[in-house]
């Protein structure tokens, strides 16, 4: 069990971009390879299911029993049978979220059609999960589920559920005291394009969470701007519809959109993992510009996942892209380490050798302060621990954003870290509101630091057309600890 630090918190804004001439090398070590040897995994999702502050890991498979790995100080045990999560159905999506507001992370699982409901909701009671789909009135028996996201759409403290479908209209299930009702048509989110990935964030900084939807098979992407609870597709106007691919064709598309602050200017950028070269849209002025070529990542590829995070604690956000396995070809994976406004591939050989092509998570699974890598794919799935030097691994902050009752139900909240007592921005990250295709987490936000021993943390909560800010000041830097910030 790791030590928690709970603090109360207000706001400040500014930035200073660190320059890096030579990126710190990164390496990862596989753990418990025998345990993670089962093939044909598609989905992973992480959360602390038992309240010990360690991140546990759910892995969904393509027709063999699903697994739930309980994490005890970095050692994993499959407890799926005892927990009630060992269904042997083709699993295409999973997301943890506190559906009933009791403080535990419940689990929504999306299954392939043909053998029962395609959406199943499991209530968590101290690590034991019970099927409550019927009591939640969540009756969906058809549809190719691709991405599920818990988000508080109406800012009432209950987590609502967004579902991206590849073959039917997308859905937004409003949570009213545990009852889930699809209201997507009435609010403008029932898009019928072939959707696979989705992420929510306040892209235009107006106090409402918008949603980026990645679409496949030549369909343009959707970017749905939220205005007073109604959504308008502004992807074309904002330059994000093509995902960096013009023209869109039947063989290309966007699988997973990722949102974060890539260039450390305090504003949200968008990465798109594509069938085709990836895109990197930096927020510039009132819009976004694709700088993938200038940043060195516009190479032909077929990627199922993108993940942002500082893997080497140099203060700059790095990018993991995994290549799909299709048509007998294993497209390459990339670990782009950022240096001097470029992204340079430094993927270790043992990471590249994992046939990962779906779920990917960068999270701190062993509590040392550094980001580890969890992968799924057609071969063995894998958990790879970051081997940063212990002192360097601690040079980060981990921030858990909770409400006034201590519940981790604020997806889309923005966390910024400043050098203590100054307005020098050291890093920014989002509370997970849709990690993208086949991956999700309820986990502390991680920000790596190149310098600074003490920091100020500020949390911006977009809700109801306002951007409420809270802060924690003069926090000692130690990534082994979790700083809990309570927001309204």
Where are these regions (language model features)?
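Blade-edge motifs of beta-propeller repeat domains
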Residues: 21-39, 70-89, 123-143, 174-193, ...
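Gly/Ser/Thr/Pro-enriched helix-cap/hinge segments flanking short amphipathic alpha-helices
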Residues: 33-36, 326, 342-488
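Beta-strand-rich domains and repeat architectures in extracellular enzymes and scaffolds
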Residues: 34-64
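Beta-propeller blade termini
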Residues: 42-51, 92-101, 145-155, 196-205, ...
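Acidic carboxylate motifs that coordinate Ca2+ or other divalent cations, activating on Asp/Glu
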Residues: 52, 56, 102, 106, ...
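Hydrophobic beta-strand segments that make up the repeating blades of beta-propeller
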Residues: 55-61, 107-112, 161-165, 211-215, ...
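Short glycine/acidic-enriched loop and turn motifs that connect beta-strands
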Residues: 64, 113-116, 168, 217-219, ...
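A short loop-to-beta-strand structural motif that recurs across blades of beta-propeller domains
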Residues: 67-69, 118-122, 171-173, 222-224, ...
């Amino acid at each position: 069990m790791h030590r928690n630090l709970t603090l109360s918190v207000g706001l400040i804004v500014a930035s200073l971009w660190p320059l890096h001439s030579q990126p710190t090398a990164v390496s990862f070590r596989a753990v418990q390879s025998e345990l993670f040897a089962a093939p044909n995994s598609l989905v992973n999702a992480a959360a602390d299911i038992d309240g010990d502050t360690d991140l546990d890991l759910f892995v969904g498979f393509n027709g063999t029993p699903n697994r739930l790995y309980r994490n005890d100080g970095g050692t994993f045990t499959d407890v799926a049978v005892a927990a009630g999560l060992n269904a042997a159905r083709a699993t295409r999506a999973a997301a943890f979220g506190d559906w009933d507001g009791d403080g535990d992370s419940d689990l929504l699982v999306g299954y392939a059609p043909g053998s029962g409901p395609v959406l199943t909701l499991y209530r968590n009671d101290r690590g034991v999960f019970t099927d409550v789909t019927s009591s939640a009135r969540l009756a969906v028996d058809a549809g190719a589920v691709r991405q599920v996201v818990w988000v508080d759409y109406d800012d009432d403290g209950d987590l609502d559920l967004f579902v991206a479908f590849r073959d039917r209209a997308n859905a937004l299930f409003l949570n009213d005291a545990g009852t889930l009702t699809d209201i997507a048509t009435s609010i403008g989110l029932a898009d019928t394009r072939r959707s696979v990935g989705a992420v929510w964030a306040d892209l235009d900084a107006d106090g409402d969470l918008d949603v980026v939807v990645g679409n496949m098979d030549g369909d343009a992407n959707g970017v749905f701007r939220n205005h007073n609870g109604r959504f308008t597709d502004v992807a074309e106007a904002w330059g994000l519809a093509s995902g960096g691919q013009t023209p869109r064709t039947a063989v290309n598309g966007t699988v997973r959109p990722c949102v974060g602050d890539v260039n450390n200017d305090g504003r949200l950028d968008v990465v798109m993992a594509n069938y085709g070269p990836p895109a990197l849209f930096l927020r510039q002025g009132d819009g976004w510009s694709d700088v993938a070529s200038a940043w060195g990542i516009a190479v032909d590829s077929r990627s199922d996942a993108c993940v942002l995070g500082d893997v080497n604690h140099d203060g700059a956000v790095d990018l993991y892209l995994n290549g799909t396995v299709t048509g007998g070809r294993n497209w390459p994976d990339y670990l782009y380490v950022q240096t001097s406004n470029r992204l340079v591939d430094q993927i270790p050989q043992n990471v590249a050798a994992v046939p990962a092509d779906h779920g990917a998570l960068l999270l701190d699974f062993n509590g040392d302060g550094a980001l580890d890598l969890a992968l799924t794919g057609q071969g063995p799935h894998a958990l790879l621990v970051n081997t940063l030097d212990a002192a360097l691994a601690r040079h980060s902050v981990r921030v858990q954003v909770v409400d006034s009752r201590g519940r981790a139900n604020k997806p889309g909240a923005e966390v910024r870290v400043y050098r203590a007592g100054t307005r020098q921005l050291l890093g920014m990250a989002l509370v997970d509101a849709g990690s993208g295709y086949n991956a999700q987490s309820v986990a502390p936000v991680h920000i790596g630091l190149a310098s600074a021993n003490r920091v100020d943390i500020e949390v911006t909560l977009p809700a109801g057309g306002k951007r409420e800010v809270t802060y924690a000041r003069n926090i000692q830097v130690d990534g082994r600890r979790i700083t809990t910030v309570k927001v309204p």
